[in-house]
């Protein structure tokens, strides 16, 4: 039985001049955005503020996670080699100073798309004053693919744990893995310590309080610095049902628990998503204070 959606999950209707500008630019340059593909509830806030989370490598994923609304196919279309250049042109046209770049999983490619991702990062880093956050696939845990992305020097590297250990085989595609995600995050922080690491967990899927706190602790042990916690919202009747709509006060308590574990920043709330822009100002200050290095 699916829980009934409460009033605190209401969102603003998208609109406004800045929202329309971002929408028109995204459409005109044929960009794929998570905001649209995943039906993100924060599209009004982010696009209205001139921020978008864009997707690389097309809009068809080789994995079929049971919480995600992105299209899936074992054999998606080939990569567009001009996509990284087009992406950088679009971001320059939008005039942003912070961009989140994510992608579908591409298990059909030898490097999982790591080289394509790195090309996009380097082009984006050529835009003055632009900070680049990437939310990448796990590349099946391949160390060299992770290094390829790290060498491109994104400012923030994110890979999402998504849920607690017990629920991972139910919630995520079987090609993903709880320990695989932790290993990718740990490798990035170990080999590229100046890159800020980030991860996200959804709640309301049937996890217990102890399981959630354990997952948060596992992320800290992997060196993750930024954590986002948000309510799972069912995209369609074909996806996993919501077991619980968590009250805002519990999110507030988890934020304090996360800070107590040592996370540098925790965004925790019903409508928070992994690419949520609430951490943007914190990250800008954090990155500016870090000394140069690998």
Curated annotation (Swiss-Prot):
Lineage per the UniProt record: Bacteria, Pseudomonadati, Myxococcota, Myxococcia, Myxococcales
Chain sites annotated for binding [4Fe-4S] cluster 1: 35, 40, 46, 275
PROSITE patterns for the chain: RADICAL_SAM
Catalytic activity: [[Fe-S] cluster scaffold protein carrying a second [4Fe-4S](2+) cluster] + N(6)-octanoyl-L-lysyl-[protein] + 2 oxidized [2Fe-2S]-[ferredoxin] + 2 S-adenosyl-L-methionine + 4 H(+) = [[Fe-S] cluster scaffold protein] + N(6)-[(R)-dihydrolipoyl]-L-lysyl-[protein] + 4 Fe(3+) + 2 hydrogen sulfide + 2 5'-deoxyadenosine + 2 L-methionine + 2 reduced [2Fe-2S]-[ferredoxin]
Protein's UniProt name: Lipoyl synthase
Homology family: Belongs to the radical SAM superfamily. Lipoyl synthase family.
Cross-referenced SMART domains: Elp3
Gene: lipA
Superkingdom as given in the UniProt entry: Bacteria
């Amino acid at each position: 039985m699916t829980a009934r959606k409460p009033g605190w999950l209401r969102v603003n209707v998208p609109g406004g001049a800045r929202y329309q500008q971002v929408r028109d630019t995204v459409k005109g340059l044929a960009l794929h955005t998570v905001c649209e593909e995943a039906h993100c509830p924060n599209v009004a806030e982010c696009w209205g503020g001139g921020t978008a989370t864009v997707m690389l490598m097309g809009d068809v994923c080789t994995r079929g996670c049971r919480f995600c609304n992105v299209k899936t196919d074992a054999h998606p279309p080939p990569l567009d080699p001009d996509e990284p250049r087009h992406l950088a042109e679009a971001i320059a046209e939008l005039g942003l100073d912070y961009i989140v770049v994510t992608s579908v999983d591409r298990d059909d490619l030898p490097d999982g798309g790591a080289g394509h991702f790195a090309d996009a990062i380097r082009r984006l880093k050529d835009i003055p004053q632009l900070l680049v956050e990437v939310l990448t696939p796990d590349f099946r845990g391949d160390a060299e693919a992770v290094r390829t992305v790290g060498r491109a020097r994104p400012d923030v590297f994110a890979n999402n744990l998504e849920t607690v250990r017990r629920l991972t085989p139910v919630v995520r595609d079987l090609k993903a893995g709880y320990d695989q995600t932790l290993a990718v995050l740990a490798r990035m922080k170990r080999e590229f310590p100046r890159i800020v690491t980030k991860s996200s967990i959804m709640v309301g899927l049937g996890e217990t309080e102890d399981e959630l706190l354990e997952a948060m602790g596992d992320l800290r042990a992997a060196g993750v610095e930024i954590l986002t916690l948000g309510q799972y919202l069912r995209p369609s009747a074909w996806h996993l049902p919501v077991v619980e709509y968590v009250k805002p006060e519990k999110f507030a308590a988890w934020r304090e628990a996360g800070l107590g574990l040592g996370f540098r920043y925790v965004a925790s709330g019903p409508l928070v998503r992994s690419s949520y822009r609430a951490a943007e100002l914190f990250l800008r200050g954090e990155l500016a204070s870090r000394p140069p290095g690998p």
